Amino acid sequence: MAIKLIVGLGNPGQEYMFTRHNAGFWFVLHLAQQFNITLAPDKKFHGVTGRGQIHGHDVRLLMPLTFMNKSGQSVVPMVKFYGIDNDELLIAHDELDIPAGSIKLKTDGGHGGHNGLRDITPHIGNDFHRLRVGIGHPGHKSKVSGHVLSKAAPDEQIAIDSALSAAFDALPLLLGGDVEKARSQINGFKLPE
């Protein structure tokens, strides 16, 4: 199946826009900009939504405005309203367990402690596609909140942006339904030495 809905998880508000936790938002914002898709507030879905053509495929975009730990309040109604099957759903989110500059495409699995996914999976299951954008782990769990809610250092941000570019390059495969080739291309990305 082809991807019909791309969700970018993050927190609303200018104070959070450039924090690591908003890596999913960055992905969707870049898509909207690159493919001239207008994003607008949509009260029905508690988020910012858009629809347009990406590499010849009709795709909806969503950025929940519910704060991360309430992402299900936005994602679930949109999935149900448009009849999006889980194999047609891609959720982009930050991932602590992957170093900055790495990116992974995964299907299935638990929430891995990610509060946005934790709020979504009880309602739709966990067999959807996830674009896991590495932001690195601060080392101790007591530092996680401060880490995800702060800006990446300039070298980390460059690494994250490079990883996101690798995902953009694989989009034609993913949108066309060739998930395995897209996964191989995305998961094989390595930062230049």
Swiss-Prot record:
Positions marked as site (Stabilizes the basic form of H active site to accept a proton): D94
Binding-site residues for tRNA, renumbered to this chain: Y16, F67, N69, N115
Residues marked Discriminates between blocked and unblocked aminoacyl-tRNA (site): N11
The EC number(s) this enzyme carries: 3.1.1.29
Active-site residues, as the UniProt record annotates them: H21 (proton acceptor)
GO cellular component: cytoplasm
Function of the molecule: Hydrolyzes ribosome-free peptidyl-tRNAs (with 1 or more amino acids incorporated), which drop off the ribosome during protein synthesis, or as a result of ribosome stalling. Catalyzes the release of premature peptidyl moieties from peptidyl-tRNA molecules trapped in stalled 50S ribosomal subunits, and thus maintains levels of free tRNAs and 50S ribosomes.
Protein family: Belongs to the PTH family.
Protein name per UniProt: Peptidyl-tRNA hydrolase
Naturally occurring in which organism (per UniProt): Psychrobacter cryohalolentis (strain ATCC BAA-1226 / DSM 17306 / VKM B-2378 / K5)
